[in-house]
Design a protein with these regions (language model features):
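Ubiquitin-like/PB1-type beta-grasp interaction modules and other compact soluble beta-rich domains
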Residues: 1-96
Length: 97
């Protein structure tokens, strides 16, 4: 079954995608990992470089990812299931020293 979700981009993710919101179709079972893979295939290589930590191959050092208003680390991480009509929000992390 196909589900429809909406991704909301904040900060640099909005600039790199050129969108505030993006509707996406996914095959069930849909996870955050599958959703992020689809986004990195859809948008520029720069979008992927900013989203995914190159050493870890993981987006979590670079982004807070919310599903239905909850951060995925409080759920099942990248294996969190995404349901039809869910809103996923990508919030960039700022690191400094």
């Amino acid at each position: 079954m196909v589900i429809h979700v909406e991704v909301r981009f904040l900060g640099i993710f909005q600039r790199l995608s050129g969108k505030k919101r993006f509707k996406l179709k996914l095959e069930e079972p849909a996870t955050v990992r599958k959703l992020l893979m689809k986004l990195t295939e859809t948008f520029s290589s720069e979008f992927k470089q900013v989203l995914v930590d190159s050493q870890l191959g993981d987006p979590r050092p670079n982004a807070l990812i919310l599903v239905g208003g909850k951060e995925i680390s409080a759920l099942q991480g990248l294996e969190t299931l995404v349901k039809d009509a869910d809103e996923i929000v990508l919030v960039p992390m700022v690191h400094g020293g």
